[in-house]
Each structure stands twice: as structure tokens, then as C-alpha cells.
């Protein structure tokens, strides 16, 4: 009886340790994944500073719309729009 109780408690303790270790790895993985996503988001913010995206307010005399996306600053509406026909 004492031996079976000892084995049962030892088994529960071992199960607790294994579950705790796997949970820690999952939390670490999710934190690492979140950090990498935020790092990518920070990099894209740097690109946004260089040029303005679609629908952003702009100044026609100082066109800062993204030329790589075929965007130009509309003189009439003063926002970045797609240039059609080029």
C-alpha cells in the first residue's frame, strides 16, 4: 500500500514537471513569435516614413507619395492616389 501511494505521488510529480516544462516552452515560443511580428512591424514603419501610402494626405508641391506603388499626390483632393495610365 505504501509503495503504490509512493509510485502514484511520484507519477503525479513527474507529470506536473513535464506539463510545466511544455507550458513554459509554449509561452516562450509565443513570446518569440510576438517579438518577431513586432520587429517586422517596426521595419515597415520605417518604410512608411520615406513615402506616403494610398489615401494619405499630401502636399502637391512636395509630392511624398510612394512612386514604387504608382502613387501621386492629387492636386484637387490633396491625398495620394493611384496614377492610372502609366
From Swiss-Prot:
Matches recorded under Pfam families: Toxin_12
Designated name of the protein: Mu-theraphotoxin-Hhn1b 3
Impact reported for residue 76 to A: Important reduction in activity, without change of toxin conformation
Effect annotated for changing residue 61 to A: No important change in activity
SUPFAM superfamilies: omega toxin-like (SSF57059)
Additional record remark: Several genes are coding for Mu-theraphotoxin-Hhn1b for which the structure by NMR has been determined. The cross-references to PDB can be found in entry AC D2Y232.
Lineage top rank: taxon: Eukaryota
GO MF terms held by the record: ion channel inhibitor activity; sodium channel regulator activity; toxin activity
Top-level taxonomy: Eukaryota, Metazoa, Ecdysozoa, Arthropoda, Chelicerata
Quaternary assembly: Monomer.
Any one Gene Ontology cellular component term annotated for this protein: extracellular region
Subcellular location: Secreted
Functional note: Neurotoxin. Selectively blocks neuronal tetrodotoxin-sensitive voltage-gated sodium channels (Nav) with an IC(50) of 44.6 nM. Does not affect tetrodotoxin-resistant voltage-gated sodium channels or calcium channels.
Outcome of swapping residue 75 to A: No important change in activity
Effect of residue 78 to A: Important reduction in activity, without change of toxin conformation
UniProt cross-references to InterPro entries, sorted A to Z: Huwentoxin-1, Huwentoxin_CS1
Disulfide bonds: 51-66, 58-73, 65-80
Domain notes: The presence of a 'disulfide through disulfide knot' structurally defines this protein as a knottin.
PROSITE patterns associated with the record: HWTX_1
Organism: Cyriopagopus hainanus
Amino acid at each position: 500500500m505504501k509503495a503504490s501511494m509512493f509510485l502514484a505521488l511520484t507519477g503525479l510529480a513527474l507529470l506536473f514537471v513535464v506539463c510545466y516544462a511544455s507550458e513554459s516552452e509554449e509561452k516562450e515560443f509565443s513570446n518569440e513569435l510576438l517579438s518577431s511580428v513586432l520587429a517586422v512591424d517596426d521595419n515597415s514603419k520605417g518604410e512608411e516614413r520615406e513615402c506616403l501610402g494610398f489615401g494619405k494626405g499630401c502636399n502637391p508641391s512636395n509630392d511624398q507619395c510612394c512612386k514604387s506603388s504608382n502613387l501621386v499626390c492629387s492636386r484637387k483632393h490633396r491625398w495620394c492616389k493611384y496614377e492610372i495610365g502609366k
